[in-house]
Structures are given as structure tokens and as C-alpha cells.
Amino acid sequence: MDLIILVGIAVALLVVIVTLYLLQKKNAAPETKVAAAPQRGVPQRAQEGVPRRAQIARNQRNRLRQNVPAAPVAAAAGALPAAGDSDHEDEGQVDGDEARVPQGAVLDEKMGAKKRAKMEAKEQKRLQREQELHDREQRKVKEAKEEAERKQQEDLEAEAERKRVDAERLAKEERERKEHEEYLKMKAAFSVEEEGFEEGDADDQDNLLADFIQYIRDNKVVVLEDLAVAFKLKTQQVIDRIQNLQADGTLTGVIDDRGKFIYVSEKELLAVAKFIKQRGRVSIAELAESSNNLINLTPISAGGGEASS
């Protein structure tokens, strides 16, 4: 009894298992057909889950960008177009499109663009800093050049001022030297010459000079040769004495081309100046005619008049 029950249970379980197996096989057959049928417009490699060559190369480039330092980035970027061209050739053999690129690859591409933008920004800042340094150096060079030119101009001005001061000093010394020489000449002119008076004391020389001046004032018009004979001097010595006396203001007058000295007193000169000032513009003929009335040329002493004639 027990054996029959066990056999019946075993047969029932076997029937159930066979039935479930047949049902499962029946349901799995349509799905297998659908999966086995190739998808139109989708590459076979994508249907099989194998990554495309272009995607593999792109992933490799992204990993290279992350591992290579910033300096060789530019060199690596130059080699990328060649790999890109081969990728496009491989993609031409595949009938797929970029719409089915995995999401991870897109994220890697975006990360590379951000890093590239960051590196470009750093490069831009570096170039800007170099430009600022260059401008600063140029400005320093320009300022140094301007400072050197300014200093050179100041040196030139100082040198010119020094030369001007030296020239004024030399001119003053020369003027003083000439004045001293003229004084010595005037002093020597009144010394007794070999053919003149015998050497006397200082009082005699002063008296002789006073007589010389008074003689000219009394005679008004004197012949230089006669004056030299009267005082036992040479004619050139007489001329030198008269010029020295004119220079210091003791005598006023003119030496004409006939060898005569015409003495004109300061009072007579003032009268002539007053006449010219009153008349305004005066011709030489009018001045000569009026001078006969303004200037008295008559000798004071008769003896002096005979000598002058």
C-alpha cells in the first residue's frame, strides 16, 4: 500500500515537471527568435555589447589627458587629429551613429574640455604676467633713459654756467689789467724823459702837470708840436698825456687831423647840449655855426695866443 502511494506521487511529480518544462520552452522560443533577429540600423558589434574602436580610442585619449602633465598637452593635442581621422574611417565602416555612445564616455569628454579650458586660462594668465613684466621692464628702461638725458642736460647747463662765470672773471681781470696799465702809462708819461727836465721830486712833477693842463686851458687851441717844444717832450708823449687826461676827465676836447688840440670846457659842452636839446634835430652846418657862439676859442693870454698861432 505504501509503495503504490509513493509510486503514484513520483509519477505525478514527474508529470508536473515535464509539463513545466514544456511550457517554459514554449515561452522562451519567441524571445530567442526576436533576439536572434539582427536590429536594423544598429551595428553588429553594438548589438553584441562590444565597444566600438572610435570609443576605445576616445577613452584612451581621455586617460592620456588626465595622466600627461600640463606642459606636453599642446604636443599631445597635435597628434590627436591623426587618431581622429582613423576613428572616422573606422566609423565609416560601421552603420551606427553617435546617438548610442555610452554615458560614461560623454562624461570623460566633458571633463577633458573643462581641464583644457582651465589650462588655457592658466596659459592666458601666464602670458599676461609676462606681458606685464615686459611692460614694466620697458618702463624702467624708458625712465632710466629720461633720467640720464635730464642729468646730461643739467651737466651741460652747469658747464655753460661755469664757462660764463669764468669768461666774466677773465674779462674783469683783463679790464682791471688794462686800467692798471693805462695808469702806469699815465704815471710814466709825466716822468722826466732824457730830453726833458732834470729829475726832480714829486712836487716838481705835480707842478709840471698843473702847468701842462693850465697851458692848454689858457690857449684853447694848441698845436701839438708847439706844446711838445714848450714842455721839452716828444709829440707822441704829448698826445699820450692829453689822451690820459681826457680819460680821467681832467681835459675835454678833440684832436683834429691837422695836429691841433681844441679844448672845450664842461660849461661850453653843456651849452651845446642844451642847444641841441632845445632845437631837437640839428644839422652839422647849424651846429658848426652855433658852436662859434657857444664855444669861445680865444686864448686867455696873448702869449698863449701867439704860441697857438
Swiss-Prot record:
Instruction: Describe the disruption phenotype.
Output: RNAi-mediated knockdown in adult neuronal tissue results in reduced adult lifespan and progressive locomoter defects due to neurodegeneration. Neuronal cells in these adults display defects in autophagy.
One GO CC term on file: cytoplasmic side of endoplasmic reticulum membrane
Q: Which residues cross the membrane?
A: 3-23
Biological process per Gene Ontology, one example term: protein ufmylation
Q: Where is the composition biased (Basic and acidic residues)?
A: 107-175
Biased-composition ranges, Acidic residues, are 87-96
* Molecular function (Gene Ontology), one example: protein-macromolecule adaptor activity
Parts of the chain on the Lumenal side: 1-2
Ordered alphabetically, the record's keywords are: Coiled coil, Endoplasmic reticulum, Membrane, Neurodegeneration, Transmembrane, Transmembrane helix, Ubl conjugation pathway
Signal sequence span per UniProt? Answer: none
In its keyword annotation, does this UniProt entry include Zinc-finger?
no
Q: Where is this region: Disordered?
A: 32-53, 79-175
Domain of life according to the entry: Eukaryota
Main location group: endoplasmic reticulum
Q: Where in the cell is it found?
A: Endoplasmic reticulum membrane
Q: Which residues lie on this side of the membrane: Cytoplasmic?
A: 24-309
Q: How does it sit in the membrane?
A: Single-pass membrane protein
- Matching Pfam families, A to Z? DDRGK (PF09756)
Coiled-coil stretches are 120-177
Q: What does this protein do?
A: Substrate adapter for ufmylation, the covalent attachment of the ubiquitin-like modifier UFM1 to substrate proteins. Required for ufmylation of Atg9; protects the nervous system during aging, possibly by stabilizing Atg9 and supporting its function.
According to the record's subunit comment, the protein's assembly and interactions are: Interacts with Atg9; the interaction is transient.
For this protein, the record's PANTHER family field holds:
DDRGK DOMAIN-CONTAINING PROTEIN 1 (PTHR48176:SF1)
User: What family does the Swiss-Prot or TrEMBL record give for this protein?
Assistant: Belongs to the DDRGK1 family.
UniProt name for this protein: DDRGK domain-containing protein 1
Please give the organism: Drosophila melanogaster
Phylogenetic classification of the source organism: Eukaryota, Metazoa, Ecdysozoa, Arthropoda, Hexapoda
